Amino acid sequence: MSDSNQIKNSSQTQQVNTLSEEEALVLSAHLKEQRSSGIPLDSDQKSIDKMIAGLGDPRGLLRLRFADSLGSVGQAAVPALCNAMLSSDQVTVRRAAAKTLTLIEDPNSLPDLVSAFLNDQDSVVQGSAMGAMAAIGEEAVTPILNLLSHPETTEMQIGLANWALAFIGDRGSKTLRNALSSGNSTIRKAAIAALTSRIDTLNADENKDLLSNASNDDDSEIRAEVATLLGAMEDTDWAKLLLISNLDDPDSWVRKNSVLSLMKLNAKEALPKLEELELQEKDRIVVNVLKLAIQKLRQTD
């Protein structure tokens, strides 16, 4: 596939100014000297355009120097970088522009980052655009959550969005907590995963209510995910009680995950309930997991 076909609505692509190999070398050396001397880089439009042209150079080290230089220029370079990311006919330039925006962390770039994420057919551009959104932090949470419910978002893009939310984590906790009441189960699931993505946040006292409420979510996938998370809780007594109640869940996947977490927590007090369920369970996979858990827990009795 040619570069010009990498962006939806490819008629809108633009040809970025190019530098000859010699021009790129001279500019790169000049930028290196300025930065080494502590001299602020030129931030006029002509200088920025030259550095952006350098993002299309075939030599990776030179591209990196131009990207770092644009990152040093900062917000003044954002409009031109966004334009290059959205409209360049060179995929190398679009990729480099998106990666460079990660260095600047400017919330004003969010609309263009969302557009590149949705419309550019190149997966590297998509990933770099999402990386730039993650670097921005809290202000990017709502746009990222909105992408989860976008009708054209692919499974790969959903994975990238979930990664970004987990990366933002505590920095976006207020917005993520508000998302727990969303009518969209995909958004609720992403918010829970982001808020509990690290062991310290998972075990924070304020997240107990989150996990308790999520254990009763209408979406069985969320309940199953919570059952797995409970197996990593440090407050094992609290987690065990919730997991034992989950053993009566109508969804077999929730029951299976609850049994596995109880086994992980060495919940010997759950043995009577597990033995009772073994006789009643109809799902063959859950029965096998029950047998394994009962055997393991009896060995530690």
Curated annotation (Swiss-Prot):
UniProt record similarity statement: Belongs to the CpcE/RpcE/PecE family.
Molecular function in Gene Ontology: oxidoreductase activity
Lipid biosynthesis recorded as keyword: no
GO CC, one annotated term: phycobilisome
Gene: mpeV
SMART domains on file: EZ_HEAT
Gene3D superfamilies per record: Leucine-rich Repeat Variant (1.25.10.10)
Alphabetized UniProt keyword annotations: Antenna complex, Phycobilisome
Name of the protein in question: Bilin biosynthesis protein MpeV
PANTHER family linked: DEOXYHYPUSINE HYDROXYLASE, PBS LYASE HEAT-LIKE PROTEIN
Annotated function: An enzyme involved in the biosynthesis of bilin.
